């Protein structure tokens, strides 16, 4: 595989600037099979789809269920993206990113007719996709290739391209189970609000005197 990034060295007339767009493209010669998920600024919790690249736009509108937390990007897919070149010598290709620091996360816009993808950066409310002070670098754009899908998991590329931890002691980190309320919230079944009161003062309002709305996920 390979990884590449863009560097912005400090220069006399290049100290601060705003990223408007990144035009990195991943072009493929054939209509490969793709395992993909719709791109969303706010959520990564959708079902994976299995289609050819050319079929992504036709499937896109049917590839998600509406929920209460949704900022979709039309005809774009999430990163990482898995592809397969069929034929006598099959090839699996994974597109991802690493070391996303002080820079927007990346999605992939689909050009289905030409079998290619272009980076689509997550914007803020003003439409800016990065406030950069030089010297600076972008995240790594990565392509991992293998004739066997399971061998992609053995690649250490993403591990090596991310910065090592700055924590000196990680012995306290242990595997555990977590039970949260997110799934109930994104389908509109539950909410954070404890009551229907519309004027709550944190540290002042006596919640014991409020009437529960019955929709809080902990109820």
Question: Could you describe each region identified by the protein language model?
Answer:
Residues 133-218:
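An acidic-aromatic substrate-binding cleft motif
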């Amino acid at each position: 595989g390979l990884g590449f990034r863009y560097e912005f060295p400090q220069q006399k007339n290049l100290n601060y600037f705003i990223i408007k767009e990144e035009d990195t493209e991943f072009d493929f010669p054939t209509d490969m099979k793709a395992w993909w998920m719709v791109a969303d600024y706010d959520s990564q919790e959708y079902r994976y789809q299995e289609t050819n690249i050319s079929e992504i736009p036709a499937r896109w509108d049917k590839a998600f269920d509406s929920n209460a937390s949704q900022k979709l990007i039309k005809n774009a897919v999430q990163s990482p993206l898995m592809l397969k070149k069929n034929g006598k010598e099959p090839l699996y290709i994974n597109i991802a990113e690493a070391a996303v620091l002080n820079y927007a996360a990346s999605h992939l816009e689909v050009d289905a007719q030409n079998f290619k993808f272009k980076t689509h950066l997550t914007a803020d409310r003003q439409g800016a996709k990065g406030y950069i002070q030089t010297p600076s670098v972008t995240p790594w754009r990565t392509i991992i290739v293998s004739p066997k899908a399971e061998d992609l998991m053995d690649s250490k590329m993403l591990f090596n391209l991310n910065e090592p931890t700055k924590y000196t002691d990680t012995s306290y980190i242990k595997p555990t189970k977590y039970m949260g309320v997110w799934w109930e919230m994104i389908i509109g079944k539950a909410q954070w609000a404890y009551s229907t009161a519309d004027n709550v003062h944190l540290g002042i309002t006596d919640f014991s005197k409020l009437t529960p709305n019955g929709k809080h996920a902990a109820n």
